[in-house]
């Protein structure tokens, strides 16, 4: 049980991006997440999750593959998903009660469970560097980014 209005799950985060995420939830988003421009070389990295959005900012799909397919170079607009989620509490309760879905099992991406179950995910486009900790290599790089004081 919780008396919170929103729940956010993240290990290392830029506070401006967090503020944007919370604003989206306060504006009525059931679930929200953050994306940023994909850096060169990340297209083929399966540990770098990509997201494609509708014109209204809702996620259409997340994948470990390079999406969308870039037919015309220079027009990619590929987005890297930053693994933070904000939930309205009722949405979080619903989400955690759902069984894993076929696409979720295929890609090993839990956010696909939300999309397959009809839960819209608002995607906030943020700028700047985000340092995720998703793999042992990411963890090894952490001290270089945040040295002890």
Regions found by a protein language model. Give the residues of each.
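Structured catalytic cores of enzymes that bind and process phosphorylated ligands/cofactors
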Residues: 12, 17-18, 22, 29-32, ...
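Conserved core of the sugar-phosphate nucleotidyltransferase
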Residues: 13-101
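Short beta-strand-to-loop acidic/aromatic patch adjacent to the donor-nucleotide binding site
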Residues: 1-12
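Alpha-helix N-cap/loop-to-helix initiation residues
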Residues: 8-10, 40-41, 131
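Conserved alpha/beta core of the MobA/IspD/sugar-nucleotide pyrophosphorylase nucleotidyltransferase superfamily
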Residues: 76-149
């Amino acid at each position: 049980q919780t008396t919170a209005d929103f729940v956010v799950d993240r290990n290392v985060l830029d506070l401006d991006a967090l503020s944007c995420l919370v604003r989206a939830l306060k504006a009525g988003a059931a679930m929200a997440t953050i994306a940023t421009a994909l850096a060169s070389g990340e297209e083929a990295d399966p540990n770098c999750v990509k997201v494609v959005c509708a014109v209204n900012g809702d996620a259409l799909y997340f994948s470990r593959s390079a999406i969308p397919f870039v037919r015309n170079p220079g027009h990619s607009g590929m987005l890297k998903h930053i693994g933070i989620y904000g939930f309205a509490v009722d949405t979080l309760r619903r989400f955690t009660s759902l069984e894993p879905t076929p696409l979720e099992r295929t890609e090993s991406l839990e956010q696909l469970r939300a999309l397959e179950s009809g839960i819209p995910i608002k995607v906030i486009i943020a700028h700047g560097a985000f340092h995720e900790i998703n793999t042992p290599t990411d963890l090894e790089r952490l001290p270089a980014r945040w040295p002890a004081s």
